Amino acid sequence: MNKMDYARTLVASLSYLLLKQYDAVGLSLFNENLMSHVPPRSKPSHFKHILHELAVLSPSGVTRIEDVIQSIVERLHGRGILIIVSDFLTKESFVEKKLKLLVSRGLEVIIFHVLDSDEVSFPFNGDIIFESLEDDPPIELDPVDIRETYQRAIQDQITYYRTHCAKLGIDYIFLETST
């Protein structure tokens, strides 16, 4: 299962469980901008709206969480739980400040950091063309030349989010698509 399908399944499952408890569930989908917003509702029939938005979601553009958090905050009223699911592959300079804003608004924030297992282990060999799910052009290279640097960068990114989330009291869950 690729990471987009993994994230869809995760969000659908969490939405289903929360709606079964009659909790209000909303959905905001974003890349560099807010692409779609389904306002929170607690009716079980609301699940079909969540599933529809997840089904039509197509990855595009660069993900910029720090630019979207303000838009999300403006749509949220009162306290609640905000769950962010992303691959967090871009290191954003002000993301810690934006996450702090969410916490200061009385929101309980949970982050699910989802990566494909191959993105973590980087098991590739020989000349390979890598294609982005977003808007980056394909690139051809020999993975052996960059494996160590790449794996260190991925681990640094995971550590960065784990550390900053812990400082802010945010639950951070790292998931690989193989789990």
Task: Place the predicted regions along the sequence by residue.
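Exposed, interaction-prone extracellular/peripheral surfaces
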Residues: M1-T179
